[in-house]
Each structure stands twice: as structure tokens, then as C-alpha cells.
Regions:
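Beta-strand-rich ligand-recognition modules
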Residues: 1, 14-94, 143, 154-251
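Solvent-exposed, flexible loop/coil segments flanking beta-strands in beta-rich domains
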Residues: 1-19, 84-151, 247-254
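Residues that flank catalytic or metal-binding motifs in active/ligand-binding sites
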Residues: 5, 25, 122, 133, ...
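Short beta-strand/loop motifs in extracellular/secreted proteins, especially
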Residues: 25-27, 133-135, 160-162, 292-299
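Short structured motifs
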Residues: 55-58, 121-124, 208-212, 264-269, ...
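Solvent-exposed, conformationally flexible loop/turn segments
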Residues: 116-121, 220-221, 275-277
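Extracellular/luminal regions of secreted and cell-surface proteins that mediate adhesion/ECM remodeling
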Residues: 240-241, 248-301
């Protein structure tokens, strides 16, 4: 890692000829890591025939976004066309760790409601390298498929809580998004159904990445992580599209450090529209960027 401590992507999705697909389509952007493996950085759902722009923090993958980087993009469409412009904005500073690595844990389509395989996510065990000082599980999950022969409109419109098992510990995950207003402030066509809430996505939105911290297992002396993802069943053509990654770091540059990753209030972000009006103290999200666990923080505002 070089002289940058964060990277933020600006994604512009445009209709240069005005004939963009009028339906929401799945898309994703991947980068090739130093080991030659492709890692999904952004999961995107296109808006209904409109142009939109998005801001996405990719600092978790800073270690693989320096130098000459190869990207590829896929959009699951056969009608109309889209143009994607991806700009990476780097911010000067010393990174949290000298080294990093990302490995796919789950990647692909996982059917819900297959009675021959009610738990499609297999159990996976990873060995931690001795040099790893921080690890986390980054989870990209979106639900798709629905219809009359389907229970509870799974998985696109099915609001359920799944269980992630990390070394036996249970972590609840609820892949669900309120789509009205659009979390990314993307204005869809009024003749569409963009306003329906969905499982982990909305039309014209970059899918949120949920993170689960694995570092406590390292500090407790454990050398492996056993990951098992349990899902509640739907039926019919229902499926999750998943890309879960084990991201690890080593060579901490700071013993005690922190950074502000988001400002909830005051904010003009649509996703914080209910909290963004400041009536008292500001609300922020911080990240521990040092090797020592934070126990207190002094903030001057």
C-alpha cells in the first residue's frame, strides 16, 4: 500500500442514446487481485431507463486498487444499453495496514425452496495466516425471483432474517431495503414499480455491503474461521445472489487510531432523511484503524 489511506468510487450510470433498458437489471463490477482472482467490488441494480450516479466507499479493497488494475463489468440485459463511468478518488495518508487480501467465500446463485437442498450455502472453514492482524467477512446479498407459485414473494420481496454462524456464534442478517425514497437518491421512471421494498436492493442502487468482524477470533487465539450461512426457505424461482468475501489485513501502521467513515446527522443523504436533521449533537460512524481496541474517543466539533 502506498501513500493513500482511503478510496471512494464515483459511479455514473448513463443512457448516452436514450434507449436504456426500461427494466431493473443486475450488474456487478469486479477487479482482479494480485493473486489473479476476481473480486466483486460493487453489486448494482439498474434504474428503470434513467441515468443515475452513486458514491461508494471502497477503502476495504485499497490494497488491490493501486498500480495497474484490471476491471470488468457485467449487466444482465439484452434490451437497450448502459454506459458506466467509474472514477476512483484517492485520499492521501498512511493506510491502516501495510498488507491486505480478499478471498471469496460464497459466490453465485443460491436457490431458496429447493426441497432437495434446503440449506444451499455450504459450511466453509478458513485457516488464518500467522501474519493476519485483522479480518472481516464482507457480505453482498440480494434476493431475486417471485410469483404466484412462490411463498411470500420470495426472494425479491421476502423480508426475512437469516442466520450467519461464525465458529458457532450466531449473527442475524436481514437483507432488506426500503426503496421509497431511493437510498441512493436515484429517480426512477414514474411508470415503474421502483417504490416496492426489496431484499437487499432497490432499482438504481449499489447494494450495501454488510460486515462481520472476525478479529475477536484472532485475538482469542483461534486459527480458523468456520462460516455457515443458514437461510429460511422460499419456493418456486427464488434465489439469493451472494458474494461473501473474507478480507484480511496485516502490518498495522498505527497502534491507536480512528477515522470517521460516515456522518448520519447533520446529513443531506436520502438514506438518512429521517435522522439527518440536526436537533442536538451530531451522529457519526467511526472505525478503529489502529491495532489497539478503542475504549474512549474525544471529539471536538
Amino acid at each position: 500500500l502506498g501513500a493513500f489511506n482511503s478510496v471512494v468510487a464515483e459511479l455514473d450510470v448513463v443512457c448516452p442514446t436514450g434507449d436504456c433498458d426500461i427494466w431493473d437489471r443486475k450488474a456487478w463490477i469486479e477487479a482482479k487481485g494480485p493473486d489473479g482472482n476476481w473480486i466483486e467490488l460493487i453489486r448494482y441494480m439498474t434504474p428503470y431507463g434513467r441515468s443515475c450516479n452513486h458514491t461508494i466507499d471502497l477503502t476495504d479493497y485499497l490494497f488491490m486498487l493501486e498500480g495497474n488494475v484490471e476491471f470488468r463489468i457485467f449487466t444482465d440485459t439484452w434490451a437497450g444499453s448502459w454506459e458506466y463511468n467509474l472514477t476512483l478518488n484517492y485520499f492521501a495518508g498512511e493506510p491502516e495496514y501495510k498488507y491486505g487480501n480478499a478471498v471469496s467465500v460464497y459466490s453465485g446463485n443460491y436457490a431458496l425452496g429447493d426441497y432437495a437442498n434446503l440449506q444451499p450455502f455450504e459450511e466453509v472453514t478458513f485457516n488464518f495466516d500467522d501474519n493476519i492482524e485483522k479480518a472481516q467477512l464482507n457480505m453482498l446479498l440480494s434476493g431475486h425471483g417471485w410469483g404466484n407459485n412462490n411463498s411470500n414473494n420470495a426472494a425479491e420481496f421476502y423480508n426475512i432474517t437469516n442466520q450467519l454462524y461464525l465458529n458457532g456464534d450466531v449473527i442475524n442478517q436481514n437483507p432488506w431495503n426500503d426503496c421509497n425514497p431511493n437510498p441512493d437518491a436515484c429517480v426512477n421512471s414514474p411508470q415503474s414499480t421502483w417504490y416496492h421494498d426489496r431484499a437487499g436492493w432497490c432499482p438504481g442502487m449499489a447494494t450495501d455491503v454488510e460486515e462481520s468482524d472476525l478479529t475477536p477470533y484472532l485475538t482469542a487465539g483461534q486459527t480458523t474461521a468456520t462460516i455457515d450461512y443458514g437461510v429460511l426457505s422460499g419456493s418456486g424461482d427464488s434465489r439469493y445472489i451472494a458474494n461473501h468475501q473474507l478480507v484480511s489485513y496485516g502490518g498495522a501502521n498505527f497502534n491507536l487510531d480512528a477515522r470517521i467513515t460516515d456522518v448520519i446527522s447533520p446529513s443531506n443523504k436520502v438514506e438518512y432523511s429521517k435522522e439527518g436533521i440536526l436537533c442536538g449533537r451530531p451522529t457519526i460512524v467511526i472505525q478503529n484503524t489502529g491495532a489497539t481496541t478503542l475504549t474512549s474517543l474525544t471529539i471536538e466539533y
